């Protein structure tokens, strides 16, 4: 069955990409502007002659206009079933994560974080615009309850094609539930998997968007970077953001605090540049995006820093890595 709402959204997207107003398209087709509006609102579908004319105008097939694309099947070979989520991990939340998953649901985290993203945020808005300007399939890894860069990408381009992924099936299903009601976009897809072992075909993704996912992953960061390189198409980009504690900041800490931090959380002192090169990326552009302090944060590293009586300064960066 044809989803008229999704047809309307695709029809509107193709028209805008062509640079036409509803009135200009109506004049070209010999119909009224009201007819075009009905199509794009999902209230009607044009007859076959007009569909053929639209397919010629937009240089797409009639099926491209009418049918939802099973993008996840194309890039993974896995059908999503009735849930429309591709699960590569158990659908039940991991035992140690159940309390956190319940907090996401009961605390309405998804909606609150989405609404927060609608406010002006120069750094995140700029990153979203940069990612949205890239053509093709965007994979958001480690989406998390905050959504990563995804909300800012959609702010810049509501028609963007995005696969949202996370290791937590709760995160993925909660985002799908919310965005189905909020946007009902035919270009949003959902998958639960470990991005240290992506179930994606080689050279299948145009852009990978990572807002702290790799920096906070449960597996090996170096493996996650290698997987990102593998699934990107030649010319594709990994746009990644995370934070680390510089050697200078470490050296300024009390000696005992240095020893404990290096023993318990050596990962926070890694900027991942060398691992990014070893993954295969040869063109890497890094920009310092800001700073944050553990005294202002609620996290395991912040708790550790407070227990040691230190206020760790993290340097945040956004890094654009191109697969040449």
Specify the residue positions occupied by each region the protein language model found.
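A short, Lys/Arg-rich alpha-helix, primarily the initiator
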Residues: 1-17
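A short glycine-rich, Lys/Arg-flanked "PGG" loop and its adjoining helix->strand segment in the class I
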Residues: 222-234
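Conserved class I S-adenosyl-L-methionine
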Residues: 74-135, 152, 171, 239-263
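A short acidic, Gly/Pro-enriched loop at the edge of an enzyme's catalytic core
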Residues: 196-208
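Class I SAM-dependent methyltransferase SAM/SAH-binding core
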Residues: 139, 144-197
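Short alpha-helix
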Residues: 264-280, 285-287
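A short SAM/SAH-binding and catalytic strip from SAM-dependent methyltransferases
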Residues: 206-220
């Amino acid at each position: 069955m044809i989803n008229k709402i999704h047809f309307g959204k695709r029809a509107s997207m193709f028209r805008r990409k062509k640079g036409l107003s509803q009135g200009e398209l109506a004049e070209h087709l010999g119909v009224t502007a009201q007819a075009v509006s009905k199509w794009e609102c999902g209230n009607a579908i044009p007859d076959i002659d007009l569909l053929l004319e639209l397919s010629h105008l937009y240089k797409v097939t009639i099926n491209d206009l009418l049918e939802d694309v099973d993008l996840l099947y194309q890039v993974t070979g896995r059908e999503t079933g009735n849930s429309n989520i591709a699960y590569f991990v158990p659908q039940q939340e991991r035992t140690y994560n159940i309390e956190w998953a319940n907090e996401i649901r009961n605390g309405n985290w998804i909606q609150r974080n989405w609404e927060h993203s609608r406010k002006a945020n120069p750094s995140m808005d700029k990153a979203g615009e940069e990612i949205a300007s890239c053509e093709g399939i965007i994979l958001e890894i480690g989406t998390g309850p905050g959504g990563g860069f995804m909300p800012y990408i959609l702010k810049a381009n509501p028609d963007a094609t995005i696969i949202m992924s996370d290791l937590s099936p709760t995160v993925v299903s909660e985002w799908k539930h919310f965005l189905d009601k909020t946007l009902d976009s035919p270009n949003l897809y959902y998958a639960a998997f470990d991005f240290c072992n992506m179930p994606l075909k080689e050279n299948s993704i145009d852009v990978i968007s990572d807002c702290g996912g790799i920096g906070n992953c449960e597996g090996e960061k170096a493996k996650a970077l290698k997987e990102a390189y593998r699934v990107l198409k030649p010319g594709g980009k990994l746009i990644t953001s995370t934070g680390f504690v510089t050697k200078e900041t470490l050296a300024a800490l009390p000696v005992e605090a240095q020893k404990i931090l290096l023993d318990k959380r050596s990962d926070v002192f890694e900027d991942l540049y060398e691992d990014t090169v070893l993954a295969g990326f040869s063109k890497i552009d890094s920009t310092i995006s800001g700073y944050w302090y553990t005294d202002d944060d609620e996290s395991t590293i912040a708790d550790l820093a407070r227990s040691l009586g230190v206020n760790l300064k993290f340097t945040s960066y956004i890094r654009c890595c191109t697969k040449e």
